[in-house]
Amino acid sequence: MLDIKFIRENPDIVKENIKKKFQDEKLPLVDEVIELDSQRRANIQEADQLRSDRNRLSKQVGMLMGQAKKDPSKLAEAEAVKKQVTDEAERLAALEKLEAELDEKVHHIMLQIPQIIDPSVPIGPDDSANVEVQRFGEAKVPDFPIPYHTDIRESFDGIDMDAAGRVSGSGFYYLLGDIARLHEAVLAYGRDFMISKGFTYCIPPFMIHGNVVEGVMSQTDMDAMMYKIEGEDLYLIGTSEHSMIGRFIDQIIPAEKLPQTLTSYSPCFRKEKGSHGIEERGVYRIHQFEKQEMIVVCKPEDSKAWYDKLWNFSVELFRSMDIPVRQLECCSGDLADLKVKSCDIEAWSPRQQKYFEVCSCSNLGDAQARRLRIRYKDENGKMQLCHTLNNTCVAPPRMLIAFLENNLQADGTVKIPEVLWPYMGGTKVLVPTKK
């Protein structure tokens, strides 16, 4: 969400940014919100004047009533002024009601106007225009067929989607045995990896209030992703980023305590509505999964450096498990409205001979901080908005698609990278239970 003052003073910049994001249907919103804001400010000015007049007249009534005790002729004058106070109170009540209505209209439009994107963001309408930046690790071309990722899991008796379908419907799964152990191992490794980078480990609430949801994501994303608890002002989190950022709502963080760096484990719950939908047989898009996430709350001047650190953490983590990856810069049309800049880290799939998304790293500038009122005082004592960033650390089971395919051997066994040995009880190779 942008500062209304910025929109008022730079409407052309805001409109050009909307065009860059291929959201021309939002262009009229800029002039509309400027007009509503003008009405709101005029309304506030009139209301302030009425309050001043009312206070002055109220004092005058008290003075006249005192004088009326000695001079009854003052009583009529006092009653006339009292009537004026009553009339102004009614007018003020009407203005305050109008102010609340205008506030709501302005706020509703402000939530729809996208954040100003970074100048380095490539311009394009959708993810087809995303730009590959660099690759890390040699993409593997095996000399034996790689089974579908669910078939690999089934060879270890490691997944039961049929039972999950009977219990919960599509988009759910049971993980079993060595595959379940591997799932927990990569989460634990991701946790310790981030702790080694100086992040504080956090287990956050898995349900959050609606005002926090509104503070961390757009209404469109909210409707497409979030499950609401019936009869409660609570939503199941789609990612722990939401509740970790929400921890700082309405906080003034001492400057010396910035940056705040947190990494968290959580289950995640998503409707997964939209063009991709739920994969009936696989586990690429599902309603429930676990994830290790990372977030940063920092000073504005530090957010670009943190952005580069975060996506590099992902590369380092995946390469330590012998998974080739690439960095893909998200274009303007693929950026969510709150994001200033974003990139995907994609892992190599030997079966498909292509890369697919496993991490998403984003700099949201002051968008979330403005909505949630996350601030700090600068060296001059002036209140400033923080910047927020987030990145996926590791999100099995999707990450395990890349892991299993890249570490699968011709005999059906799966090699466990050395970094995971301590988390697998020393197990170095997984042996299938059935061919």
Residue ranges and their predicted role:
Residues 27, 135-435:
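TRNA-recognition modules of translation machinery and tRNA-sensing kinases, especially anticodon-binding
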Residues 1-140, 154, 158:
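N-terminal alpha-helical targeting/anchoring segments
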